Each structure stands twice: as structure tokens, then as C-alpha cells.
Amino acid sequence: MALHRLTRIVMGVPNVAEVSSYSREFGLSPASEPHHFATVDGGEQLRIVPAVSRRLVQLGVGTDDLDDLGRISSALDRLGVACTRADTSLTAVDPGTGVSVRVEIDDRIVQKPATEPVYNAPGVLGRPGTRADGILRQEGVRPRKLGHVVLGSTDQDASQRFFLDGLGFKVSDTVPGLAAFMRCSSDHHNVLVQQAPVSFLHHTSWQVDDVDDVGRGATAMLKADPDRHTWGLGRHFIGSNFFWYLKDPARQFQRVLLRHGLHRRRCALETRRVGRIELAVFVGSTAPGVLPRPRGSRRDDDRSS
């Protein structure tokens, strides 16, 4: 795959200063410009800009070379989607979400492997005489990289064609009538586009080292403000990842994430059509408005009104 990662996102919010303060508390590092933030491995991956309501202004995708840009430009032309070329990038707008996507030549992320957690289990004495590493850590949790974004689209089919047939993403899983999980890297998904009555940014996710850091990171945020809790701790069926959803001052969801199941060229997960019942294997309490609904479905309170 010529595409290899999400490079950065530009996120529009009405309260830039508040969301920037939250992002620092979340563990992102201030970068060279005000309201720009970096991850440990991905460099600068978040820019926060003013907007009337929360939205994803731009999504950056990394590719290898000029030939890749040429192929993507031709594919977008076949779809009837205009793009703007620059020396080392091209930009096009997804018709379903209105998000500007900038495909740019950039270095691949090389991540230092996280330390593998050692567990005691029935019949397995992995760490005799020692406490679990996760309970001894004192340092704050810092995201390793941007994991994925989830977008609401008023034309999910058009958005799916844009990312798959235009940009060259691969599909990992689908929820018929609702969503497609698509990847531009070895992660299970980097972009999820779901059908919605309006275009919006549902959430961003940020990778951490292990499930202890999912819990530690979320717990630290909730100690400062319990109302930030949205959904977690849990584990998704799709992607196999542990998660904890939080909400920022723009009422947008952010997710602390342990890495997804992986797709490799020679060892790919089977693509599945999955249903709502398989969203999570186990999960803590859920706040209203987190879970998407298939086209044509209604909540119980909708039917009673």
C-alpha cells in the first residue's frame, strides 16, 4: 500500500483555548505553533483552529512518492472529484463529509516497540514475586500517535468511494447501511465513515502502549472532571482494541486507544460485515449519543414522541 499513515488533523472548534488546554491535559505535547500538538512517535498531529461548530477541517494522509500522487490524482479524476496539486501533495474534498483531505509525501512512522506486559494467569506465573508494572508507573500517559478519525457523512456511499477508489484506502470491515472501516496503514482502520443526517466529526482516537495506560490516562482525565466520561473501559469487537471514550470542551469525543488488530500483507484479518450487536465485547457505562444508528432506525424515545 502506497499510503502509510495519518499525518495530522486540523480540527475546528468554537472554543480553541479550552480545547487546547484539554489537549495538553490529555497528554499531547505543545508543538512549535500555538494550538498545535504532537504525539510521541507521530510528531505534530493536531492543529486546533476556530470554527462555528466542531468539525474536521482537514485530514492529512502520508504517502511515499510523486508516482503515488499521480495515481491518486488520476483515480480522483475518474470519480469526477477535483483535486489541487502542489509539489509534494494534493488536496481534495470528500463530497459526503466536506472534509478536505491532503495526501502528502512524508516519512513513515517507525515506532519503538512498547514493553510487552507480563501477566500472571491460571497455570502461568509470569512475574513471580513482583507487582504489575502498570500499577507502579508514575509518569503521565502520552499518546504514541493518532489512531483514527470517525466522520458522519450525509452520503456514506460517496464518501466510501472517495476514500477507497479515489485515495486508495483499503476496507477492513463494514456495517451494512451504516459504516465502513477503512485503513491507510497496518492498523485495522484509520478512517471510519458512518451515515449521518449532517456531516460532523464524531471522534478522534489516540494510541497508547497498553490497557493499563488506557485506564490510567482516562482515570487521570476523570479525576479532573468526571463529566468527561462517555464510554469505557471496554473492548471493541471490530478492531479488537481496548478503549475509553472521553469528551472534550467542544462536546466532541476523544478516545484513549490500545492498538487495533493489524492488517499485514501476508497476514490480513478477514473482512466482515458486522452488526450493531458486535460493537463491543465488554464495556462499562455508556453516555447517550455515542453509538451510531443504521439508516432508517429510530431510538425508543423517537418512537414514543
Placement of each model-derived feature along the sequence:
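N-terminal beta-strand motif that seeds the catalytic metal site of vicinal oxygen chelate
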Residues: M1-A17, L56-V61, P117-D157, H188, ...
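Short amphipathic beta-strand/extended segments with alternating polar/hydrophobic composition
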Residues: R47-V49, V101-I105, V193
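The feature marks the first
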Residues: H4-P34, A38-R71, D77-L79, R295-S304
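Structured core of small recognition/catalytic domains
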Residues: D157-R235, N241-W244, D248-A250, Q254-V256, ...
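Vicinal oxygen chelate
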Residues: L6-P14, A51-A75, D77-R142, K145-T154, A180, D225-S305, ...
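Core segments of cupin and vicinal oxygen chelate
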Residues: M1-Q45, P95, L151-H189, Q194
